[in-house]
UniProtKB/Swiss-Prot annotation:
Name of the encoding gene: atpA
Function according to Swiss-Prot or TrEMBL: Produces ATP from ADP in the presence of a proton gradient across the membrane. The alpha chain is a regulatory subunit.
Protein name per Swiss-Prot or TrEMBL: ATP synthase subunit alpha
Single GO MF annotation: ADP binding
Pfam families registered for this protein in UniProt: ATP-synt_ab (PF00006), ATP-synt_ab_C (PF00306), ATP-synt_ab_N (PF02874)
EC class name: translocase
Cellular component GO terms held in the UniProt record: plasma membrane; proton-transporting ATP synthase complex
């Protein structure tokens, strides 16, 4: 049989034209080792830093180390079922978490999955956990207060909306208590709160949630929990996830407050991940970019301008500035604030509140050291009445601490020094405050006014707090109109000052304390 070359070529052409070939291009690699949640992958190309990788069993990881012939990734969640030789695929996506008002009142993990047993979150939107902070041009100066309800903070270390104020101290000296009081005091103040628990015992986190529910604070609070039993990856990601949830409100012209409790544990988790990824260790075995770990997080807390909000919402929200206020917590070891992470975070934040174990053990709670605590920008946000009355308190306290040290060695003191010491003792007593009992602005103003004008000087030190409480109760029942004026105007006019003076003198004469 004779084959015609032209027929053969025609046949081949027709076959080629009728061929249906589908090309499915997928970028995939192979697991070569798994160690403590860190996976090394060979064969992945075109993978991005921070990209999500898909492992078998619907498990995801995060690409962190991009090397010449391998990729180092951290697993998000359980990794026991992953073994050598498993196929890993790129997703082309970066890690996102759910955001929106649906999260308020819920307890979620670092990936936004609910862990409170109240069903799915049903958030309509998601957002990237790593975002660039707003530029200088989009920011506004801090000018509105965040009232914590804690006398010593609101009077001496005021916090403004959009500020970053560090809470620093040893373990068990009241750092979380200060943060929780700040959340509880936001009831009815149109401020969404986010509490990020990092590396704490699950039972401690549960106690926090229970206390927030008891005080009605969960109605405006989101809790992001990465407990000590969670992986290092979850503890590393939790603050960024919480920050993204807070930015949703900031960028839409609302105010939010976020508490990171605490960033020391996040730094430990990041150190663990970095060492397992074989990154070169530096001071205290932390990797070289541990400063950037916290700076890129805390720079996202800001007060943004009306123009920023309008641009972000495509003109839907006009004339409103948003804010995200951050209260990072750092745990020191034996009061050493010169360690690597504490000094880093002190330099990033706009001030710090130092809590001291010695003061805590002496019964001065909250155990705030007024001498070294400072707020660099909060003074501009203080309410008029508190600003007017708080200057004398700080001076009295600072002079008292200085004189008290000298008085230990001096046998006979002159009258002026003795008076200064006596007033200092009473001011120190006045600034004591039980947990979960934050004060309103007018209550703080009344206490400061009484201290500044010598109404506490002739009282016994043990009577100071009972006098203060009795005075507040008396004003509530007999001078409600005066309270309302102070609360509404956030100022103390000449007439109101006269009325307040008369009310205090009348109460003091009655001796009902």
């Amino acid at each position: 049989m004779q084959l015609n070359p032209s027929e053969i070529s025609e046949l081949i052409k027709s076959r080629i034209q009728g061929l249906e070939a589908s090309a499915d291009v997928r970028n995939q690699g192979t697991v070569i080792s798994v160690t403590d949640g860190i996976v090394r992958i060979h064969g992945l190309s075109d993978v991005m830093q921070g990209e999500m990788l898909e492992f078998p069993g619907n498990t995801f990881g995060l690409a962190l180390n991009l090397e010449r012939d391998s990729v180092g990734a951290v697993i998000l969640g359980e990794y026991e079922h992953i073994s050598e030789g498993d196929v890993v695929k790129t997703t082309g996506r970066i890690l996102e978490v759910p955001v929106g008002p649906e999260l308020v009142g819920r307890v979620v993990d670092a990936l936004g999955n609910p862990i409170d047993g109240k069903g799915p979150v049903n958030a309509k939107l998601t957002d990237a956990i790593e975002k660039i902070a707003p530029g200088v041009i989009w920011r506004k100066s801090v000018s509105q207060p965040v009232q914590t309800g804690i006398k010593s903070i609101d009077a001496m270390v005021p916090i403004g909306r959009g500020q970053r104020e560090l809470i620093i101290g040893d373990r068990q000296c009241g750092k979380t208590a200060v943060a929780l009081d700040a959340i509880i005091n936001q009831k009815g103040k149109d401020l969404i709160c986010i509490y990020v628990a990092i590396g704490q015992k699950a039972s401690s986190i549960m106690n926090v949630v229970r206390k927030l529910e008891e005080t009605g604070a969960m109605e405006y609070t989101i809790v992001v929990a990465a407990s000590a039993s969670d992986s290092a990856a979850m503890q590393y990601l939790a603050p960024y996830a919480g920050c993204t949830m807070g930015e949703y409100f900031r960028d839409r012209g609302q105010d939010a407050l976020i508490i990171y409790d605490d960033l020391t544990k996040q730094a430990w988790a990041y150190r663990q991940i970095s060492l397992l990824l074989r990154r070169p260790p530096g001071r205290e075995a932390y990797p070289g970019d541990v400063f950037y770990l916290h700076s890129r997080l805390l720079e996202r807390a800001a007060r943004v301008s009306e123009e920023y909000v309008e641009k972000f919402t495509n003109g839907e929200v006009k004339g409103k500035s948003g804010s995200l206020t951050a209260l990072p917590v750092i745990e020191t070891q034996a009061g050493d604030v010169t360690a690597f992470v504490p000094t880093n975070v002190i330099s990033i934040t706009d001030g710090q509140i130092f809590l001291e174990t010695d003061l805590f053990n002496a019964g001065i709670r909250p155990a705030i050291n007024a001498g070294v605590s400072v707020s660099r920008v909060g003074g501009a946000a203080q309410t008029k009445v508190v600003k007017k009355l708080s200057g004398g308190i700080r001076t009295d306290l600072a002079q008292y601490r200085e004189l008290a040290a000298f008085a230990q060695f001096a046998s006979d003191l002159d009258e002026a020094t003795r008076k200064q010491l006596e007033r200092g003792r009473r001011v120190t007593e006045l600034l004591k405050q039980p947990q979960y009992q934050p004060l309103q602005v007018w209550e703080l103003a009344v206490s400061l006014y009484a201290a500044n004008n010598g109404y506490l000087d002739d009282l016994d030190v043990k009577q100071v707090l009972s006098f203060e409480k009795g005075l507040r109760d008396n004003l509530k029942t007999s001078h409600a109109d005066l309270i309302k004026r102070i609360e509404d105007t956030k100022d103390l006019s000449k007439d109101d000052e006269g009325a307040l003076r008369a009310a205090i003198e009348s109460f003091k004469k009655s001796g009902a304390y």
